[in-house]
Swiss-Prot record:
Cofactor binding mode and count: Binds 2 Zn(2+) ions per subunit. Zn(2+) ion 1 is bound in the active site. Zn(2+) ion 2 is bound at the dimer interface by residues from both subunits.
Protein name: Penicillin-insensitive murein endopeptidase
Name of the encoding gene: mepA
Compartment(s) of residence: Periplasm
Annotated EC: 3.4.24.-
Amino acid sequence: MNKTAIALLALLASSASLAATPWQKITQPVPGSAQSIGSFSNGCIVGADTLPIQSEHYQVMRTDLRRYFGHPDLVMFIQRLSSQVSNLGMGTVLIGDMGMPAGGRFNGGHASHQTGLDVDIFLQLPKTRWTSAQLLRPQALDLVSRDGKHVVPTLWKPEIFSLIKLAAQDKDVTRIFVNPAIKQQLCLDAGTDRDWLRKVRPWFQHRAHMHVRLRCPADSLECEDQPLPPPGDGCGAELQSWFEPPKPGTTKPEKKTPPPLPPSCQALLDEHVI
């Protein structure tokens, strides 16, 4: 196993060992009609659905962490996408983190995934279903070269291109985050059908999975959507800027103090956490 794969596994494992946040003390969805509240990186959810663990089209990883909750729209998206993938004979979709029962802030590994509208999906589609042991300790497949400038040709498969494209074409999806090298390969492979590329955004890490984000549901009145991605396919200067060396004097941004919770989320926390 190479160093990058080991690091990815360590990151998965480390998030479970950090101190719990108050949101992790809520072990069941909060009753009520489904409402995503706040922003993706500062919010919560009422009336979350549980993604069924058993499915012929997908498998859920790390069920011991209990991060398989989300807005009903997210559950339906996962079922819709995995059914499409299965019908095309592409393999089994591997589902990573969604959100916690009431959403909210994680103890590590994610800044977002707080409103029940985000899901991580591995960029591999096994033809043979994984065992319980494999699902509990998943082996991330790093698709990006060590220098970060391109995908590994022997690991990049047409099925992965199709998986990302199918997700991006879904009506409820607003963004998909992938590594810049993966976005670059999508740009090369896309041909003339390029409208969907607008939703695929380059971001740090994301070498072995895609992070799919849905738009705010119309009836979630306190949900804060992001602005739409810039027009175009995103394959030009913006993408190339990710491969340029840091400018002299560039320093890492200081870690910010988390902003106050939306009032509805604070009230939910006060009511359900002793």
